[in-house]
Amino acid sequence: MSGVCLLIDAGNSRIKWALADTGRHFVTSGAFEHADDTPDWSTLPAPRGAWISNVAGDAAAARIDALIDAHWPALPRTVVRACAAQCGVTNGYAEPARLGSDRWAGLIGAHAAFPGEHLLIATFGTATTLEALRADGRFTGGLIAPGWALMMRSLGMHTAQLPTVSIDAATSLLDELAANDAHAPFAIDTPHALSAGCLQAQAGLIERAWRDLEKAWKAPVRLVLSGGAADAIVRALTVPHTRHDTLVLTGLALIAHSA
């Protein structure tokens, strides 16, 4: 079907969007925070439809609808949901529909991006999610843990003496820690220790899962990283990995063009 497709990935922290052409190439793209002003789409070509992954709830859904209505009120919209099988990926969840739409679209995007390879997909957002995807497209299961920022924020909120450290502050603290080899990898004050400890928890989860998966499958597994906190977590990883930051939008493009 001709015409560009509007793709929207509404996560808990921000909303990413793109226009994809018939070749599934992104014509233009962007992102905005939930609290930010709405983006200006007035100069965009009219899409043939919108494909939406929304894990951020009803308020985000209403905002997305209002944004689309302001530019193309009659635009058809498809709210993507996980299903048993789609675009070459088979859903291994006990109840396939309960898998998050972002994880489902990301699996589809990853399978297309790395055909014929076993994959462990690690996405770093509000939550850190892991998906095990076999080369034949079978999603065999996953893990969900608090994201790096959520870990640090939870410690600050639920302890009497630990500070609340933001990602920006933690990144600066880790830069300082890395510059002082005499103290790495251990910190000598609380903010540095909290930042590094939560980062190492993320890296340890990923590396343990990757090694366990290679052992279970008795085959090489490509570790694919995505998400806003990936830049920081990469610095703590000691295993081979590949970055791909548009897995969900890529998966949405595939879903749209299969419709």
Curated annotation (Swiss-Prot):
One of its GO terms (molecular function) is ATP binding. Its cofactor is NH4(+); K(+). Substrate binds at residues 93, 100-103, 190. It comes from the Bacteria. Belongs to the type III pantothenate kinase family. PANTHER family: TYPE III PANTOTHENATE KINASE. This is Type III pantothenate kinase. It comes from Burkholderia thailandensis (strain ATCC 700388 / DSM 13276 / CCUG 48851 / CIP 106301 / E264). The lineage of its organism: Bacteria, Pseudomonadati, Pseudomonadota, Betaproteobacteria, Burkholderiales.
